[in-house]
Design a protein with these regions (language model features):
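Intrinsic low-complexity, intrinsically disordered or marginally ordered coil/linker segments
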Residues: 1-219
Length: 219
């Protein structure tokens, strides 16, 4: 099983496009590849859908599609191995124009992706749709990274390096730090981990002190 990367995204664009995205993220009956969000952003060639990702190199497939399997294609073109089809926190907002008619909307939602955020799929979608903008955030605590992707610009940080003082680091007071912490509760989780580590350290020290006094110690 992969590590799961947490994502939140805001997509702004014409109502026709936002209508399609809203239909995808609210669809609870994901039955075929065409139902996936990333498949809408950047469709995988149909000839790769039923291939086997066993590490072998299929020369015929590579010649035709540039890839041996769905896995190789997904990692390169989506930045993640699987499509995403479970969403939460779905919210749509109309953007009124000067004449009061809404021709644009923005939609917000969250989802999880395997190992990494699907930023290559975002890139492809905004390249193909110049009237669409995407701002997305992501956090993968197990692999120690997080970031903000804004219309092709990806600011990615190693959490332990950008915030070496943990939950009290000054990074969490920056605009990027506040945004990511508000979305993913990073400092709260850090503080809990730090408290657990401190309790364990104190417990270990107490056992050593008790033993040095000749008192019975549970081991």
């Amino acid at each position: 099983m992969p590590n799961w990367c947490n994502n939140n995204i805001k997509i702004t664009g014409p109502n026709k496009i936002i209508d399609k995205i809203e239909k995808i993220v609210k669809n609870e009956k994901y039955e075929k590849p065409e139902d996936g969000l990333l498949q809408y952003f950047h469709p995988m060639p149909k000839g790769l859908l039923d291939t086997t990702a066993d590490g072998s190199k299929d020369k015929a497939m590579i010649k035709k599609y540039g890839y041996s399997s769905w896995y190789d294609w997904c990692v390169d073109n989506w930045s993640t191995k699987w499509d995403v089809n479970e969403f939460y926190g779905i919210r749509r907002v109309a953007i009124p124009s000067i004449d009061g008619k809404s021709v644009l909307s923005e939609i917000h939602f969250g989802f999880d992706s395997a190992w990494a955020p699907p930023i290559n799929a975002y890139d492809k979608f905004i390249d193909d749709n110049s009237n669409v903008s995407i701002r997305a955030t992501y956090m993968e605590g197990g692999c120690d990274f997080m970031g903000i992707w804004d219309n092709g610009i990806d600011d990615c940080w190693t959490i332990s390096e950008i915030a070496p003082k943990g939950s009290i680091d000054k990074f969490w007071k920056t605009s990027a730090g506040k945004e990511l912490d508000d979305l993913y509760g990073i400092t709260e989780n850090m503080a809990q981990y730090e408290a657990d580590q401190e309790a364990e350290r104190i417990g270990d020290n107490k056992e050593i002190i008790d033993y040095s006094k000749g008192e019975k110690v549970n081991v």
